């Protein structure tokens, strides 16, 4: 039995459940190593089952150990029969399912108690093992190189879409399987929109260019943002940039095992507030990354939780002034017992090209 399944069973026992159905495909992969568009896991103390369909049966047999593997069209009926034959009664399920899927569960598991579970596997995924960390580090190195290469590509007259496409294609050329998310590429006043979509707008001298991008490598993601300037930079632009950079670096300097979620957000936010730009920092400081681009933990001013060694988090302060421009700097960091390790290594000093 692998360590992830054992941790799953320990948590399941704490919740007094006889078994749990997992149908989130990334959680299925996390537990089994199986990657496909159809897969449902059922884990109980005595049996661990993966149900897929005939398209994936060969792959599942090759990729998965420690699970019984079934190819069935009705995965819930298959799992329900197993649960009932075992005499189980209290069955957990992931609560982010459609209404129709829930109705199917009610029919299949009639007579058994169905107990919704929130972020059951996602909570286990917060702490990365050495293999996961190495994979994320590789994804980050691809993003770093793509950014470096983009600096030579960007010229006045290139459009936001052309630059975004360059980043996307370059990451694939460097070994990425795909993108973590649709690349955000915003220049000039568009950079004041934190999640702007790239447009057919040419970049112009004197503009800020914000690039938020990442790639997939062996199913794990990177997530990096850099802001650069084309031709020249004003005093106000430089002041705002250096304020964001100071906030970003302050969190890198202080993030470590045991730091409270509230402080993780407060440390960089206080710097931006003290500089007079607090109202222009309009989003959270960061989130976890891994199999998903946004995953646990998320940070709240009211949370009493603490960050832990093995978490991989984003550090992404920003300032956005409507109608003018914006700045965001984002890094991926690995939390350790004594501090944090910076995984995104692309330069962050104020760059003018």
Positions of PLM-derived features:
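Active-site neighborhoods and metal-handling regions in enzymes and metal-associated proteins
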Residues: 1-353
């Amino acid at each position: 039995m692998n360590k992830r399944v054992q941790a799953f069973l320990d948590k399941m026992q704490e919740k007094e459940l006889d078994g749990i159905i997992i149908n989130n495909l990334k959680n299925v992969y996390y537990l089994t190593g199986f990657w496909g568009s159809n897969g449902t896991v059922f884990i109980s103390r005595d049996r661990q089952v993966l149900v897929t369909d005939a398209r994936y049966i060969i792959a599942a047999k090759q990729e998965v150990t420690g699970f019984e593997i079934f190819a069935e069209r009705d995965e819930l009926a298959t799992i329900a029969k197993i649960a009932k034959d075992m005499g189980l009664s209290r069955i957990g399920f992931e609560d982010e399912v459609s209404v129709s899927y829930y109705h199917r569960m009610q029919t299949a598991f009639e007579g058994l108690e169905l107990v919704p579970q929130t972020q059951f596997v996602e909570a286990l995924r917060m702490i990365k093992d050495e293999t996961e960390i190495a994979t994320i580090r590789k994804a980050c190195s691809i993003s770093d190189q793509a950014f470096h290469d983009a600096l030579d590509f960007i010229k006045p007259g290139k459009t936001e879409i052309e630059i975004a496409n360059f980043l996307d294609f370059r990451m694939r050329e460097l070994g990425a399987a795909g993108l973590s998310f649709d690349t955000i590429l915003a220049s000039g006043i568009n950079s004041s929109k934190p999640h702007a979509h790239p447009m057919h707008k040419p970049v112009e001298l004197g503009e800020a260019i914000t690039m938020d991008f990442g790639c997939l490598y062996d199913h794990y993601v990177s997530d990096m943002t850099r802001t650069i300037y084309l031709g020249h930079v004003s005093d106000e632009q430089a002041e705002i940039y250096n304020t964001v950079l100071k906030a970003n670096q302050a969190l890198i300097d202080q993030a470590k095992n045991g730091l409270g979620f509230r402080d993780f957000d407060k440390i960089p936010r206080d710097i931006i507030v003290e500089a007079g730009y607090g109202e222009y920092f309009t989003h959270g400081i960061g989130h976890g990354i891994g199999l998903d681009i946004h995953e646990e933990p998320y940070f709240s001013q009211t949370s009493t939780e603490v960050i832990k060694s093995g978490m991989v988090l984003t550090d992404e302060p920003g300032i956005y002034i409507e109608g003018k421009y914006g700045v965001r700097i984002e890094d991926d960091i690995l939390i350790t017992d004594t501090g944090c390790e910076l995984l995104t290594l692309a330069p962050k000093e104020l760059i003018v090209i």
